[in-house]
Structure formats: structure tokens, C-alpha cells
């Protein structure tokens, strides 16, 4: 599931939708609208997962296609729900 992929690969930096490396670049909808190339869209989230940026590594070739899709969907859904007020 997307939650499992996130927990196993992303949560060390993005615990509860936050960001321990770059404060402010959290995984809330409003924050992603500001800093993510393409804004808060599944396409923009997937691009970031695949290619990385700055200190975030690229996950293409590490995660398989289904894992990339699952974690993209998970981040997208959490961003406007439980992580809406992430800091």
C-alpha cells in the first residue's frame, strides 16, 4: 500500500507529512501549491518522487512502478486530510 511504501522509504524525512530537512516544504496541500513544480497535482508529486530535487533523492529505479503510483496517491490524499496542517 502507499502507506507502507511511505513508511518504509519516506517517513525518515517526512514523518507525519513534515520535513526535517527543509522546514516549510511539508506535504500539506497548501505548502505543495507554493513550492512544488506544477503545484498540488498527482503529476507534480509523481515527478518529484521519480526525480527528486535538492536533498530529496530520486526514487525511480529504487521503487517499482506500482510503488511510485501507490505512494503518489497516498501523499496526494494525505495532503488535504491528515497532513493539511503539517509543519
Curated annotation (Swiss-Prot):
Its main location: plastid. One of its GO terms (cellular component) is chloroplast thylakoid lumen. The keyword Thylakoid applies. Keywords: Chloroplast, Electron transport, Heme, Iron, Metal-binding, Photosynthesis, Plastid, Thylakoid, Transport. One of its GO terms (biological process) is photosynthesis. Monomer. Belongs to the cytochrome c family. PetJ subfamily. This is Cytochrome c6. It comes from Euglena viridis (Cercaria viridis).
